[in-house]
């Protein structure tokens, strides 16, 4: 799968603006940002737990 180019990103942005309207767009962006922060922190925590469990396995 190839990464999205500028034309595809522009189309997606236009669709988002049409669907949500320009008034709700800042709220949607804020919500997406919060969700991404939570997702990233959960991934870091999961990786940390996985490393700790593999360290425990190696010690035993």
Curated annotation (Swiss-Prot):
Kindly give the InterPro entries that the UniProt entry links to this protein.
TatA/B/E (IPR003369), TatA/E (IPR006312)
Q: Note the superkingdom of the native organism.
A: Bacteria
Q: Which Pfam families does the UniProt entry name for this protein? A: TatA_B_E
For this UniProt record, give its keywords in alphabetical order, as a comma-separated list. Answer: Cell membrane, Membrane, Protein transport, Translocation, Transmembrane, Transmembrane helix, Transport
> How is this protein positioned relative to the membrane?
Single-pass membrane protein
Gene that this sequence comes from: tatA
List, alphabetically, the PANTHER family matched.
Answer: SEC-INDEPENDENT PROTEIN TRANSLOCASE PROTEIN TATA
**Species of the source:** Corynebacterium glutamicum (strain R)
- GO MF annotations, alphabetized: protein transmembrane transporter activity
Assembly and binders:
The Tat system comprises two distinct complexes: a TatABC complex, containing multiple copies of TatA, TatB and TatC subunits, and a separate TatA complex, containing only TatA subunits. Substrates initially bind to the TatABC complex, which probably triggers association of the separate TatA complex to form the active translocon.
The beginning of the lineage is:
Bacteria, Bacillati, Actinomycetota, Actinomycetes, Mycobacteriales
Q: Is Nucleotide-binding one of the keywords?
A: no
- The residues that cross the membrane are 1-21
> What do the Gene Ontology cellular component annotations say?
TAT protein transport complex
Described by its record, this protein's role is as follows: Part of the twin-arginine translocation (Tat) system that transports large folded proteins containing a characteristic twin-arginine motif in their signal peptide across membranes. TatA could form the protein-conducting channel of the Tat system.
Q: Which HAMAP family match?
A: TatA_E
Which family does the UniProt entry place this protein in? Belongs to the TatA/E family.
Question: What is the protein name given in its UniProt record?
Answer: Sec-independent protein translocase protein TatA
* Location in the cell: Cell membrane
Kindly state a single biological-process term from the GO annotations of this entry. Answer: protein transport by the Tat complex
